[in-house]
Amino acid sequence: MYPELIHLAASFDQNYLTPFYVLITSIFDNNKETSFHIHTIVTGVGNQEKEEMQQFVRQHNSNISFYEIAPKDIEGLVIPEQSYFTRATYYRLFFPLMVPETVKKLLYLDTDIVVVGDLSEIYHTNIIGFPVGAVAEVNATKNRPDLGIDEIGAYFNAGVMLMNISEWKKQEISERAIQFLHDFPEKVVWVDQDALNVVLKDNYVKLSAKFNVTPFDIPRYLPKSGYHNFLKGKIIIHYALREH
């Protein structure tokens, strides 16, 4: 019997190579019965480093693919002043346009994530008819009236996204998000996450909060046993430490 295959996506530049290794190590350690195909868009990383990444991934019965992004694809996309973002944050918009047609579903993960459980449940979530599944932010950016997102709990965090490739492409999510970024740079705070929330308003599957736990979701001043109990059953811990 062949192990289950899950398609993952991660994008980063040379500054996040070490966090990428932390991410995939946590995935392999907690999903030993699963094989992965990791689709990556990486810049600033040399061929030697890519070969080392490939060797590491193959040791865990998995594969990795590298995709190239053209500078013109992200030219003119805004990075807010005094922001810690780089243009690499925009790379994730391009995965559905780049992966082979055999990939029907793709789980995108930011590189500031540690996986502490089985990814099968999130990967097999039913998102038929929707371009994406994501976790709504209820303790950070609850809504964004300036973007036309008034409902509390409607704004989602794009650090974990389960992409339905055919629906995403059919609805031209990437193209519409990029167009928004070009048309309304003055509205952009959380870069492509803002754009995706605009074009996917009322059009995504809300995933369980256990699949994207940020520091803002964790209660403060609990005893150690309280934190242990809170984290029980959680799957993805996302170290998004900038307050929204």
Regions found by a protein language model. Name each.
Residues G76-V78, T141-D146, F216:
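Short, charged, surface-exposed secondary-structure boundary motifs
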Residues F36-G44, A134-V135:
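Short internal beta-strands
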Residues E68-I74, A88-A140, G153-Y155, L162-M163:
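GT-A fold catalytic core of metal-dependent nucleotide-sugar glycosyltransferases
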Residues G133-N139, G153-H244:
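Catalytic core and acceptor-binding pocket of nucleotide-sugar-dependent glycosyltransferases
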Residues Q48-M98:
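Active-site-proximal specificity loops/subdomain of glycosyltransferases
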Residues L77-R87, L147-E151, Y221-G226:
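Short, surface-exposed amphipathic charged segments that create phosphate/polyanion-binding patches used
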Residues M1-D29:
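N-proximal low-complexity "stem/linker" segments adjacent to membrane-targeting elements
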Residues H7-A9, H37-H39, S65-Y67:
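A structural signal for isolated positions on well-ordered beta-strands in alpha/beta enzyme cores
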